[in-house]
Amino acid sequence: VLGAAFFAIPNIACKIIGILLLFLWFIMDCSDGEVARYTQTFSRYGKEIDYLAHILDHPCVNLSMWYTYVQISTYNIYIISALFITLISAELITRNLIIMEVYDKDKKAKNDKVFKPSWMKWLFLQIVYFPNIVLFLPIIILGDYVGLYNSSYILAFIVAANLLNTANMYRKTLKKCYKAL
């Protein structure tokens, strides 16, 4: 949340500090689960806190990126707002679908096949899953903020890819639910 707050401040130094704090958040977010797995100390409380942190952090980061686009004042605020509302909504739906799938897998046997996507699917998933967006989109927006290029096309592509991924996940979830009936 602190990284998002710094990124929202209309100052280039604050935006760079915000990006660095977002990278630090990402490292800490990844490492807490790894430490739990390594030490074999899992708790339901830890999972819930991690989930709650994502529910709070992700919209805050999206709002800070949206506010930076508003500060650029080159783009139509309604289109940018619609893109970010769509991105936040798709991300929250995706997060809930992932959690539903994780809880469903916890109930099943552990000897199921491991999903290994093709390299193109893997690359697509890296682009659309939110923590990865936090790593590259603020840097791209920063380039737009200082006037190097127009990043709205990249934003539109990311939103479209997120919508496709969310729709696909939702379709698969519905298919599983109807098969269970």
Model-derived features: positions:
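Multi-pass membrane catalytic core of lipid/isoprenoid biosynthesis enzymes
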Residues: 1-6, 19, 38-95
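Membrane-embedded alpha-helical segments that form the functional core of polytopic membrane enzymes
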Residues: 1-45, 148-159
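Hydrophobic alpha-helical transmembrane segments
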Residues: 2, 24-33, 74-83, 97-110
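Structural signature of transmembrane alpha-helix termini at the membrane-water interface
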Residues: 5-9, 31, 63-70, 90-97, ...
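Transmembrane helix-loop junctions in multipass membrane proteins, especially transporters and channels
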Residues: 8-12, 38-42, 66-73, 100-107, ...
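Hydrophobic alpha-helical transmembrane segments of membrane proteins
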Residues: 10-15, 28-31, 56-58, 62, ...
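Alpha-helical transmembrane segments of multi-pass membrane proteins
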Residues: 22-28, 84-92, 157-165
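C-terminal membrane-associated helical module and adjoining short loops/tails
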Residues: 95-181
